[in-house]
């Protein structure tokens, strides 16, 4: 019986995706895997037979600890879209030939919606051809939009970064009494979980952002400007957190009102959304005649491992370990989800869910977690998100900067 396993990473990276890699690797070794292979650049790299032996690369405790503290995808990523196996089996024949060649008994793919699509297709094809290879999805996305899981590893650390940096921006903007507006653009194409996390900047030492704009609520320029004008009557500095995916009622992205449409990736998604904060800043300046500034947090949101949430790191590691356990228990076609079993104290456990019910679906922010005017989130959102950013991980510093591990 085959006793080797292989792990891949796909889609956009996070601050803790490598913690999940470490979790799968350590658990697979403990459960008896002879060799643990890694795909270089996901399924696309595997199709080119680009593999590494993780047993050789991660053979000591320091390597594992550095891996857990290293942002981005250690193995490299891709956005390769497998065709439907019923329409074109060519890549599947190649992949399953490689699984046989390397005596693979389990495949783990760490990623978001599109990665779960890959696992769903591989498990479906495997069932059709009678393969014994098990396929398990390991969730990852800062967008927090995967279904059937309380939240997704990667979100907590991104939320912690957003809340921290926005809190510092709020402090910076308060130095002058000149009337001004600062608009911070935060990632989130269709779901506003990241922008909503801006509320976590609030506390007894900070009011947090004045407005939060989410993709779930259509943008109304007149209503927005009236609200900003109202705020400026009572305070000099207004802070706005806006999702990059905010759209008008007709579905037009605000960023498209200031830039031409960008390229699409293999899954049909616009590769980069950028310009929402610029549009809003210009609108405020032109209509309200006040100083305004646009800030884009951009990719910094997903790679700030120096500000990672310990809760997030630990949960990312746990879902990796649970994925290995599920595969060695005979499960296939599953994704490891997080299930919240306690609020006070906060606690989540892992469970395996049907990946077919996750792939290509998106979880939006519940409308009852959004304020009636559509420009803030409620206390329920904060109660949900606050535990996910708690506690810190100390980087390993060398010569004044965090030490990372790489291929």
Q: What are the residue ranges of the model-derived segments?
A:
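C-terminal non-catalytic interaction/assembly regions of soluble proteins
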Residues: 253-407
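Short glycine-rich or small-residue beta-strand-to-loop segments that form or flank ligand, phosphate
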Residues: 4-12, 73-79, 105-111, 137, ...
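Glycine-rich oxoanion-binding loops at beta->alpha junctions
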Residues: 49-105, 114, 153-155, 167
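Short glycine/serine/threonine-rich phosphate/pyrophosphate-binding segments
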Residues: 14-24, 46-47, 90-93, 113-121, ...
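N-terminal phosphate-binding or glycine-rich loops at protein starts, especially the Walker A/P-loop
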Residues: 2-52
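Accessory alpha-helical/coil subdomains and C-terminal extensions
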Residues: 36, 98, 106-111, 117-132, ...
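Short, ordered loop/turn segments at secondary-structure junctions
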Residues: 10-12, 39-45, 79-80, 112-113, ...
